[in-house]
Amino acid sequence: MNIVITGAKGFVGKNLKADLTSTTDHHIFEVHRQTKEEELESALLKADFVVHLAGVNRPELDKEFSLGNVSYLDHVLDILTRNTKKPAILLSSSIQATQDNPYGESKLQGEQLLREYAEEYGNTVYIYRWPNLFGKWCKPNYNSVIATFCYKIARNEEIQVNNRNVELTLNYVDDIVAEIKRAIEGNPTIENGVPTVPNVFKVTLGEIVDLLYKYKQSRLDRTLPKLDNLFEKDLYSTYLSYLPSTDFSYPLLMNVDDRGSFTEFIKTPDRGQVSVNISKPGITKGNHWHHTKNEKFLVVSGKGVIRFRHINDDEIIEYYVSGDKLEVVDIPVGYTHNIENLGDTDMVTIMWVNEMFDPNQPDTYFLEV
């Protein structure tokens, strides 16, 4: 299928093009400000589907709203009258189309123009009124508060919040792209007779700001945010996409001694924490037990043995472990345990524990295996 994307260099256009080229065999024609007239005409006359994303939202003069959102669409439709395949057309409109302002009025005029075209020429059309959008590749300091806040917070720049209680209606760009793909396949999401993008979020500005600062702090205290809330999951992915390319990595605190090292990697309030333990050859670590704290050990490099003994018994249980055969070993409560490096190289063990370490209540009691 030949798909034309106008506004292909914009926020949604870049995400849509990246997805379509990665997941489909469609031939994509990109139309943008640098596209020559003959290239535009050639693409539109070959089109099986047109995704019209091009538009204007922050011009210097109000009259540019009409030029960008109505006149350009009219020009595209004029060319499409000569496309005998009658391609379906998807228009990105805005929830502001119902509002009395130059931008909203131009969007409404564009909708009316497309409907009239469909009635006259018989093309299938999909008109989507999108709310505020967020996601990767959205231009900061322009038209998106989330993009601007992500960019600034990731760079330790000050942000301005005039009213924390302002509620935003939002769609995530991946949901937009998924819906466009459904429309291309002829299976759009229709609610009350209107094409709709699922997963509309209503979130206050204050909630967004608080989450973004938590995400920033999480790199310092080695925590992971809760990701069971879809909006928070999408916002976290968005925030990370605005990290400076020189700031992808961050240091961990390595506790190093002559036995090796122990380093906390990730901590969560409800799923425990993950650490990396490195033991030098011949070293034994552990010899303690827990009442409630439980662990999982996974040796990923080297070889060794994990020994257990019930604190009320003399029997010693051994599990031989190796990075050549990845196996998880559960560490039950009430068993004293240790881990010994039996190899000639460092042994690396991933350790999960069911709770974050609390120095005031470590639940760890020394006892030789």
PLM feature spans:
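Substrate-positioning beta->alpha
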Residues: 140-148, 162-185, 206-210
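Mid/C-terminal beta-alpha module of Rossmann-like enzyme folds, strongest
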Residues: 182-254
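Conserved beta-loop-beta element that borders a ligand/cofactor-binding pocket
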Residues: 112-137, 147-151, 157-166
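A short glycine-rich, His/Asp/Glu-containing loop-to-beta-strand
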Residues: 248-287, 293
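Conserved Rossmann-fold NAD(P)-dependent oxidoreductase catalytic core, especially the SDR/UDP-sugar
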Residues: 74-111, 118-121, 126-128
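NAD(P)H-binding glycine-rich loop region in Rossmannoid oxidoreductase-like domains
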Residues: 35-75, 79-83, 96-100
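N-terminal Rossmann NAD(P)H-binding glycine-rich loop of SDR-like oxidoreductase domains
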Residues: 3-19
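Double-stranded beta-helix
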Residues: 313-315, 342-369
